[in-house]
Amino acid sequence: MNIAAAHTTLLEVARLDRVDYALAWRAMQAYTDTRTPASPDRIWLLQHPSVFTLGQAGKREHLRDPGAIPVIHVDRGGQVTWHGPGQCVAYLMLDLRRMGLGVRELVERIEAAIIATLGHFGIEGVARRDAPGVYVDGAKIAALGLRVRRGCCFHGLALNIDPDLGAFARIDPCGHPGMAVTRIADLVPVGTDVSRARVEALLLGELLAVFGYDPARVRESGATEFPAP
């Protein structure tokens, strides 16, 4: 994978709190459908209330026992996953045509950013070509799900910081029965700062690096403001 050369695209970053999944999904769709070749790219950093999402390739049988947790069928690639408190979710609305990126390279760059983020904690993450995401000793620590429309991507990644992993026992994570799932909090020494703020800051820095954004062209919208389309 070649790291992107610096470019002059404006990037808008929103660090949000807990956002309803359907609200974020509709907003991503609206921005992607209405953006122009001159529109800035966007990255949203947030978390969701507990929810299962089933991608376009998802099968109901992988929802083994959803219980009272809502299930939403969505337009991203991939199978079933869980989102909830304790995750760092990053949604990427990027103009791939402007960057000259294909889908495979997009996935590889996101995975590289996650792996580099884990490296700050002394955690060795790896990617698997047959199952997108990032893994530590065979257990999944980050999931990817993307959609490309009109040459632009949306959706993104979910990195497990310190969530209750019990919800993953109710599904076949990403469509793989028996897949183990892990989190940063279980892989670092006691007392390590694994706050969401720290993980988000590290992840954002690595995303800027792998996609070649000029830090001077990054604009933050504020701590809790939800951007309009």
Language model: regions and residue ranges:
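A structural signal for short, well-ordered beta-strand segments
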Residues: 90-92, 132, 144-146, 157-161, ...
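C-terminal accessory segment of soluble enzyme catalytic cores
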Residues: 154, 166-229
